């Protein structure tokens, strides 16, 4: 039986491990931390349970298809509920709830702009086509050769995919009300560029948002990780935790040993052997820190020229009261959307008056906070690579967010805070070896799509492959599941003999 080692147990790592086990390989996952999940880990403190990273469950069909691939379903591992309203947007003057029901949403659009209900139908008809082609075809490509894209259906539909039109221009064709425009542009904010730089192909995200809905796995997003880990273990995958990979030892262009430090008191070094290694940790870290220079596919200049999706400034907050005026997901769009976008992607500076997001899972789920309490997750998108990430700076931002949160919601929480922990650029570097402290990976710009992304196979090491948000298909939880499947498919194809 061929042996494979997967470095890292985020969504992509567990996915790749599971597909390799299904193909009959002996699979070991080496994880630096004490639990699986990568950015989707969780922690518990004072009776509060916090998801550390992803908080939006979109594209439920991708998760269902993943479990179906192994003869299972989502319901075998965790329970989902659809949120209605999907989320609340706080404009400068008033909040707006985004209903899950399509007819109600159309009525909302029409109330803001005459004719917008019909325009939404047209917009989503196009977005549905993009979603179908994007999820079923484009993201399934390994991005190793242009010939992969010689596909009659793709060629016929190239214009309909709007690859060469910007998201901003595309949205502007349908809607004039600034609130509607902002609402339709917001899902691409985390893809790594301003709406004027992101291809309108990604209006497929609006289809995911509006038609497929916003869901919540009971007990939080880490339940998805637990479910995937459970399935992987049923398939025979072994998970080894507190194993920090230090070096990949190469002989004649092949990895012969994976050197690992045991986290803990002894911190002893041990060697693992495998026929193939999958890097599901940070691509840049594996290339520049684990490989000898002669075996790196990309130099530092290459990485410096990459456009990164954002990092984040996060606060995990527990309060000793219940709130009446917030939903599960809350988007605070009470400041200048475009200015904040420029601070993330153009000037790359600490934002002056940023948009922010608050997730309150305890509004939906009593199990994540003590009785009579709320757990709040504040998130500010910021540029990757920012310096000066000090406790003082974090405290200053938190004070700003608190003032705006209290003003908009009419809820006083400052004196009710019983727990607070912050997380930012330096933590992403320390915990995940994240290049420039990125949170979401490589930006999905046109010049960083498909074959223009870092390759899922090393160009210089015969048995080293990659998966995750710095390679195909790109950032986000559903794409990470697909990334694991795509790399496994390539390995099985290459090593079938």
Where are these regions (language model features)?
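A conserved FAD-binding loop/helix module that cradles the flavin
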Residues: 54, 469-491
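Active-site-proximal substrate-binding core of FAD-dependent oxidoreductases
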Residues: 250, 493-497
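Rossmann-like flavin
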Residues: 92-198
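Mid-domain catalytic core of redox enzymes
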Residues: 246-369
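C-terminal segments that line or cap access tunnels to active or ligand-binding sites in enzymes
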Residues: 320-426
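N-terminal glycine-rich phosphate/pyrophosphate-binding loop and immediately adjacent elements
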Residues: 2-132
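A glycine-rich dinucleotide-binding beta-alpha-beta segment and adjacent secondary-structure elements
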Residues: 177-191, 353-357, 411-473
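Helical element adjacent to the flavin cofactor pocket in flavoenzyme catalytic cores
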Residues: 204-255, 259-262
């Amino acid at each position: 039986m061929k042996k494979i080692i997967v470095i890292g147990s985020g969504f992509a790592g567990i996915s790749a491990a599971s597909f390799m086990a299904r193909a009959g390989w002996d699979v070991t996952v080496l994880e630096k931390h004490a639990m699986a999940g990568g950015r989707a880990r969780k922690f518990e403190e004072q009776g509060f349970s916090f998801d550390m990273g992803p908080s939006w469950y979109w594209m439920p069909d991708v998760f269902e298809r993943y479990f179906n691939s192994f003869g299972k379903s989502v319901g075998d591992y965790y329970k989902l509920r659809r949120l209605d309203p999907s989320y609340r947007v706080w404009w400068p003057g008033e909040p707006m709830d985004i209903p899950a029901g399509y007819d109600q949403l159309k009525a909302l659009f029409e109330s803001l702009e005459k004719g917008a209900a019909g325009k939404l139908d047209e917009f989503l008809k196009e977005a549905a086509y993009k979603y179908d082609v994007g999820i079923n075809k484009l993201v399934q490509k390994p991005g190793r050769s242009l010939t992969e894209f010689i596909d009659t259906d793709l060629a016929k539909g190239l214009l309909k995919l709007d690859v060469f039109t910007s998201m901003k221009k595309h949205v502007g064709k349908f809607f004039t009300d600034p609130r509607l425009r902002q609402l339709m542009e917001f899902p691409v904010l985390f893809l790594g560029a301003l709406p004027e730089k992101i291809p309108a192909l990604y209006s497929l995200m609006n289809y995911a948002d509006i038609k497929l809905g916003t869901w919540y796995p009971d007990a939080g997003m880490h339940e998805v990780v637990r479910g995937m880990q459970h399935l992987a273990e049923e398939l025979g995958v072994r998970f080894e935790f507190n194993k920090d990979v230090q070096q990949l030892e190469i002989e004649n262009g092949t990895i012969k040993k994976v050197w690992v430090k045991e986290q803990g008191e002894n911190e002893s070094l041990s060697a693992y052997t495998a026929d193939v290694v999958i890097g599901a940790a940070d691509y840049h870290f594996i290339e520049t820190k684990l490989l000898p220079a002669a075996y790196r596919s990309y130099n530092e200049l290459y990485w410096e020229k990459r456009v990164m999706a954002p990092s984040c400034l996060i606060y995990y907050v527990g309060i000793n009261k219940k709130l009446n005026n917030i939903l599960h997901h809350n988007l605070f769009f009470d400041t200048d959307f475009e200015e904040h976008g420029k601070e993330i992607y153009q000037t790359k500076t600490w934002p002056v008056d940023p948009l922010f997001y608050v997730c309150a899972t305890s509004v939906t789920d009593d199990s994540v906070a003590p009785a009579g309490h709320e757990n709040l997750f504040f998130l500010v998108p910021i540029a990757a690579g920012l310096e000066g990430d000090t406790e003082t700076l974090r405290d200053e931002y938190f004070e700003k967010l608190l003032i705006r949160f209290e003003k908009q919601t009419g809820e006083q929480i400052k004196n009710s805070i019983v727990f607070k922990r912050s997380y930012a650029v330096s933590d992403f570097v320390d915990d995940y070896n994240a290049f420039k402290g990125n949170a979401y990976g490589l930006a999905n710009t046109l010049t960083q799509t498909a074959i223009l992304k870092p390759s899922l196979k090393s160009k210089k090491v015969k048995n080293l492959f990659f998966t995750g948000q710095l390679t195909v298909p790109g950032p986000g939880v559903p794409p990470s599941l697909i990334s694991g499947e795509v790399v496994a498919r390539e390995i099985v194809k290459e090593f079938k003999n």
